Amino acid sequence: MSSWFNVGILCLLRFKNVQDNKIIFEAIFEVFLHFLKIPVYMTHLGFPITPTVCLIEMLGLLLLLLIPALFTLIWIYKYIEPHSLISIPGIFVFLGLYVPFVVTLLIPIDVTWDVSLSIWRFLYWLTFVLSWIILPFVQGYMESKFSTPRSRLSDSFYKNLRYYLLLTFLTCVVIAYLRFALRTMSFSNFKELVISLTYFWGLLFVIFLLGNGFVYVPVSMWKKAFITKRAALLERQAVGVYSKLQARLESYSLPSSSISLNNGRNQSSSDFFTSSLTDHAFNPHSSPNGMSNVIALQTTWNQMVKEYNRIMLIKTAKASGSYRLYLPDSYIPIHPVVAYAFYVWILPAFRILFSIFMASMSVIIVVSEVFLHTQYSLVGIILQKFTNSSATSIFVSFLFVYYMRYCTYKSLMRTQFAPHYYYALVPFRATNTASLIYFASQLCRLTLPLCYNFVSLQPYPTQFHQFYGESIDLLPLGNLISKRYPTFILLPIIFSMISLKYRLRQFIYSITLRKSSSASSSDDFDDSSLNSENDDDLFNETSAAYLAEGRALLLGTNNAHV
């Protein structure tokens, strides 16, 4: 009531001696700004507080809210059919993707200017409620096998109740340890403990995903610039994707004898897919994600075949020396000479330059992580060079934080954890609703720790650090984690550079082959036939036999389509 009373008194004082419309206009704007408490950022640039400046300010804030909403809708339309999102889950999915985008845009502004603490409090608790309560509940509802809404609500409630009880037990263990063992915890700062625990949980995955993305994103862009490497990558992935598609179809009791890795060369997988569905009844609710799992793999396979076909056309055009490239499946008709120049010269050169730029960004951020909270942080040194230009400082900060966000999310999409086998984001609107809800909840959990990690790389005080960082640093455990753990980013980088996962897989395959060889020799079989190069090469994803198998699958499907 007091705020409304103050606004009313301000109106009376303003309108008491009103003489013209200009004073009325200024009074309305001052009352509006007083009520909303909107910080006028243009005053930092030397502009006086006038109605015109306030109008420009509000239009800028409106654009700041509408641009992320537009990109969020485009992103959702890229991965899922809009009609598949029913009203209430669709709203929460939109919020789960929209709020991290807004936070990413506000961080560069907060580095240069000041964003209100009330905004950060609202955004933090909104992401907290979305990621830990609402989105898991909606996801459980969408994945429930029951048919009625009431039974699905009950099923989702009991599933999440077990999860929350486990989290509560772990939280109580941490509180007891801090309170009685270290004597650094009091119940007066329970809110700070919750913020620290959620921050550590998010940072634990952010550093791993960020380090993996710093290697994967530039390397993948570099490989795309060379058609030979891109073709080899598709050939190497073809057998795995085709095998997963076969396994999914077999798990849904579709005829498994109609498809195999050898006979599949003479039949299109899409033709098999269509004929299987027309000849046999299929219940979409027979599995947690229903038919969408098969559709996602089928879409991935079709896009691989389409891209491999384009690579073959580019190779043929380069070998012919005609400087003409004909693309019959192109959405936009392009002149053959223009298509040749774009796909052979312009696009590869752009990808090479862009991969070098992203590799440089990765090196700068990794060095800054190693020298965190020191004067040797390269991100802080670069931002200090642009202190005289606020717009340039915001732009450079946005480049760094968006690149970190892109590497983290890209690594999250490709990380082969157990849940991600069912929660996969597939473009061309082949993603199921449960996968989109799952990734929206993960983005909400990872965005704030990621943004705070970026804020720690630069020396300027921010309102985000005042709310989020001081709550973390209030506890010795949170302070230790925020200052020491980011240096472990070198571990996932080293693992990605040496392809540790591939080497471990090859080691396991070699042990399996050795055991099978010894078992066969004890049964008086011929050792040479079991240790032949063909058997060995079937497990080697870089061998000529493995690549030839993938090439045959891709070309066989392509010829079937033709």
Curated annotation (Swiss-Prot):
Q: Which UniProt keywords apply?
A: Golgi apparatus, Membrane, Transmembrane, Transmembrane helix
Transmembrane region positions?
Answer: 23-43, 56-76, 88-108, 122-142, 165-185, 199-219, 330-350, 352-372, 381-401, 480-500
Protein location: Golgi apparatus membrane
What InterPro entries would the database entry show?
A: GPCR-associated_LMBR1, LMBR1-like_membr_prot
Membrane topology, from the record = Multi-pass membrane protein
List the ranges whose topology is Lumenal: 1-22, 77-87, 143-164, 220-329, 373-380, 501-562
What ranges are annotated Cytoplasmic (topological domains)? Answer: 44-55, 109-121, 186-198, 351, 402-479
Gene Ontology CC terms: cytoplasm; Golgi apparatus; Golgi membrane; membrane; plasma membrane
Q: Which residues form a coiled coil?
A: none
Q: In terms of one coarse class, where is the protein primarily found?
A: Golgi
A Pfam family in this protein? LMBR1
What protein family does this chain belong to? Belongs to the LIMR family.
The family database entries (PANTHER family) matched by this protein are listed as: G-PROTEIN COUPLED RECEPTOR-ASSOCIATED PROTEIN LMBRD2 (PTHR21355:SF0)
Query: Per its record, how is this protein called by name?
Result: LIMR family protein C622.11
Native organism: Schizosaccharomyces pombe (strain 972 / ATCC 24843)
